[in-house]
């Protein structure tokens, strides 16, 4: 059967068409802009901690002021004057055969040379620490790159800096997994999932051990001054070990700068995460009623040590965090609580018997 035809519909007038359509202004691109064009992506809002760390990085970036330039120029002029005067004294002592003065000039030259060498060494180590931030930015760019040829050389440089031998099983698995058709993003991602976890696992063990030692020391020791000295020493040692694991050799000023960065990072971004990670679990388990005051203080000190280690790990790590592989305080919290409770139970058992 065929369906009946629908009747015709007559309209009173023509359809209304917008006589003034709104168009955006024409925008032309030159050849250079066309080659560097990248489509905009709608990403999720960055995390609060990332925003805070960006503000912190901007605040920590040194500003080249006029006074600083004047001080540096004065120091350079003073150094040149000292060197020139030393050369003149040496020439006069040689001409007059004043061997005592000549020996003093030689001793002064050795002292100045040692001082200059120390300054150069400290500057090189501090520069190496700053370069790690640039390497992290480069790795972040490679993780969003579709080019080829740079990822493998970059990862091999990171492995060499970390002291990973070519015969290491993780590095061998990475070599076996990459091939010529992969772009830089895939090569760096494979390195981040196959090789980088080896160093991260060692850093996690160092953080866990230092946090546990800090927790037990505070929970057992009755002397607050000893506790403070012990925590400071353990935290500095933890930072040194983490930096060494990631191939960074710290000098005096670079160690102070890293410690300053870690403390500022904790001050800017640590409070909210500490409350978020610890607060709910602390209240739900009613730890204040189960543990003594010293034990609670020990857990707090251990968590702060763990937080310091995590931020030192983040600043020394050559790659950004990928796929939520960043360690959290919750990873160390349960271990610290278990160790404190076990220690308290061992201490009570002999007295009860």
Curated annotation (Swiss-Prot):
Q: Name one Pfam family in it.
A: DUF697
Residue ranges annotated as transmembrane are: 70-90, 100-120, 213-233
Q: Where in the cell is it found?
A: Cell inner membrane
Q: What are the entry keywords?
A: Cell inner membrane, Cell membrane, Membrane, Transmembrane, Transmembrane helix
Describe the family membership recorded for this protein in Swiss-Prot or TrEMBL.
Answer: Belongs to the UPF0283 family.
The record's listing under InterPro entries reads: DUF697 (IPR021147), UPF0283 (IPR006507)
The name this protein carries in UniProt is UPF0283 membrane protein YcjF
| GO CC, one annotated term | plasma membrane
């Amino acid at each position: 059967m065929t369906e009946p035809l629908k009747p015709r519909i007559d309209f009173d007038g023509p359809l209304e068409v917008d006589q003034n359509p709104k168009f955006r202004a024409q925008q032309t691109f030159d050849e250079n802009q066309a080659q560097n064009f990248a489509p905009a992506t709608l990403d999720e809002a960055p995390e609060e901690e990332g925003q805070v760390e960006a503000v912190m990085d901007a605040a920590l970036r040194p500003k080249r002021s006029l006074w600083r330039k004047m001080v540096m120029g004065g120091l350079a002029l003073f150094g040149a004057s000292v060197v020139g005067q030393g050369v003149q004294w040496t020439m006069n002592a040689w001409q007059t055969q004043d061997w005592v003065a000549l020996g003093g000039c030689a001793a002064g030259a050795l002292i100045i040379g040692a001082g200059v060498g120390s300054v150069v060494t400290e500057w090189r180590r501090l520069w190496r620490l700053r370069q790690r931030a640039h390497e992290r930015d480069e790795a972040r760019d490679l993780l969003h790159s579709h080019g080829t040829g740079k990822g493998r050389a970059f990862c091999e440089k990171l492995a060499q800096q970390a002291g990973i031998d070519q015969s290491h099983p993780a590095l061998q698995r990475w070599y076996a997994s990459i091939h010529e058709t992969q772009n830089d993003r895939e090569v760096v991602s494979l390195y981040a999932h196959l090789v980088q976890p080896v160093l991260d696992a060692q850093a996690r063990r160092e953080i866990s051990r230092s946090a546990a030692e800090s927790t037990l020391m505070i929970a057992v020791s009755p002397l607050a001054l000893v506790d403070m000295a012990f925590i400071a020493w353990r935290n500095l040692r933890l930072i040194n070990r983490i930096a060494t694991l990631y191939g960074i050799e710290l000098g005096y000023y670079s160690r102070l700068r890293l410690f300053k960065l870690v403390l500022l990072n904790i001050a800017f971004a640590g409070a909210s995460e500490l409350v978020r990670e610890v607060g709910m679990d602390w209240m739900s388990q009613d730890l204040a009623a189960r543990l003594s005051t010293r034990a609670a203080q020990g857990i707090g000190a251990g968590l702060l040590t763990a937080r310091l280690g995590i931020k030192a790990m983040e600043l020394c790590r050559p790659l950004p965090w990928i796929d939520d592989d960043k360690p959290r305080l919750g990873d160390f919290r349960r271990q610290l609580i278990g160790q404190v409770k076990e220690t308290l139970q061992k201490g009570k058992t002999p007295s009860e018997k």
